[in-house]
Amino acid sequence: MWAPAGRRLPSWLMSGSEPPGPKDAHAPLRAALLREPWIVIEVPEPIRSEVLAVRRIVSRVEARTPVGIGSVGPLPPQNLDEVRRVLDQVADETAVIIGRFAAIRRFPQTRYVYLAPDDEMATSLLILQDRLVEAGLRLLPDVYQSTPHAVIGRVPPEVELEVAARARHLVPSPVFRMTTMALWMLGEGEASCLHRVAFTGVL
């Protein structure tokens, strides 16, 4: 996902924190209030499951959790019907995005690790982000034009070797095709897809 170094990312995605326990009567309400909208450029199976397997080494990950590269969020307040319209419009103008993971990297001065796509895929994702903004999607300033990536999470020293070994077959990964993007609501232990569109353009 897009996220510049130093920016606080959602704890469900970036940390090893656990969702509220079953005895917390207010957990469902709190989870609902903390959910945030994201546009996720979706990584397909079987690569998605392989990325989630690496993430599970460092944090609890729900089966429904999406994996994206170059995804944007959380979105600032805006009409979600308008967001759906933007997704429909841009998907009609955008071709399937093809590429692979090329490297595993760490954000500077942090323990947060991510998978980086190859240059051609990264360029296609930045073009897609421009199209979303030009069509009317509102983004927070620190999200726009950040480096496309797929987050692994915060990797403590004691599991670095395990993460590196598990991720080795993803760097480089087989070539894969990203054919969809979707509007997701994401929060602590929560993930629900509100709208999904397929890329049907030629460029």
Task: Describe every region a protein language model picked out.
Residues 113-121:
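Short histidine-centered catalytic/ligand-binding loop motif
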Residues 2-98, 121-177, 192-203:
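Basic, often amphipathic N-terminal segments
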Residues 38, 112, 180:
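Short hydrophobic/aromatic beta-strand or adjacent loop that forms the aromatic wall/cage
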Residues 102-110, 146-148, 182-190:
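Short proline/glycine- and acidic-rich turn/helix-capping motifs at secondary-structure junctions
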Residues 71, 114-115, 152, 183:
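Short hydrophobic/aromatic-rich beta-strand segments that constitute the beta-sheet cores
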Residues 117, 186, 199:
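Active-site donor-binding loop signature of nucleotide-sugar glycosyltransferases
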